[in-house]
Regions:
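Class I S-adenosyl-L-methionine
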Residues: 6, 38, 44-52, 61-211
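SAM cofactor-binding core of SAM-dependent methyltransferases
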Residues: 2-47, 53-56, 63-64
Length: 211
């Protein structure tokens, strides 16, 4: 089974998937993250990736995040800043690439905020999870949207505001997701979330073999 991580960053998804026996390729435009292939996904040729079974796509969330609401990147549903226009184009290019390689399963991840409002995701299946459900201890809740084609056997785990498993983070506070020191820390996908999805994918692709 072969997997592809677009916008791999910390490569936590690939670490989880490799531990389950999936052969991974990581792609990121930032050379500091040391991906297998350093480039923008806009520059990829779908013909080179026709054997991919599963894709994880993590586009930059900067203009879509709750913390960017006051910056006015969008007005009445229209991207008005150069940053928002570039982000929309980048996400659409990633989705076009995924459709072109047509993997059995794929997921695009972004915090629960403005990406879900963009017109180019309205026809996609969407699930919402809480990151605190996939990490040990008391951690930020970080509600996160997952778009794409996921296995029917996989069940998203969603928490509720005020639950004791995560750090309280009223809007405007500096706890919760806002309390992470860097954007890279905020972007790390929980290992167990990635692993739970991959286990379900493998189970369905192998006719019910349970992990």
């Amino acid at each position: 089974m072969k997997g592809l991580e677009l916008g791999s960053g910390s490569k936590e998804v690939s670490r989880a998937w490799r531990d389950l026996g999936i052969e991974m390729i990581t792609i990121d435009h930032d050379p500091e993250t040391e991906p297998d292939i350093c480039c923008k996904w806009e520059d990829l040729d779908p013909a080179d990736y026709q054997d991919i079974d599963i894709v994880w796509f993590s586009p930059d969330c900067t203009v879509y995040s709750v913390m960017s609401f006051p910056k006015g990147h969008f007005k009445e549903g229209v991207a008005v800043s150069d940053e928002a226009k570039a982000s929309d184009a980048s996400v659409e290019a990633g989705l076009d690439f995924i459709r072109a390689i047509d993997p059995g399963f794929w997921v695009m991840e972004n915090p629960r905020a403005l990406l879900r409002k963009r017109p180019f995701v309205q026809d996609l299946d969407r699930y919402t999870v809480s990151y605190c459900q996939y990490r040990a201890g008391i951690t930020p809740m970080k509600p996160t949207d997952l778009f794409g084609v996921l296995p029917v056997s996989w069940e998203p785990q969603m928490c509720r505001n005020g639950a004791p498993c995560h750090i309280p983070a009223p809007r405007g506070s500096y706890t919760g997701t806002q309390g992470f020191q860097t954007a890279k820390e905020r972007a790390v996908v929980p290992y167990e979330l990635a692993a739970s999805i991959a286990r379900s994918c493998i189970t369905e692709m192998h006719g019910g073999w349970q992990f």
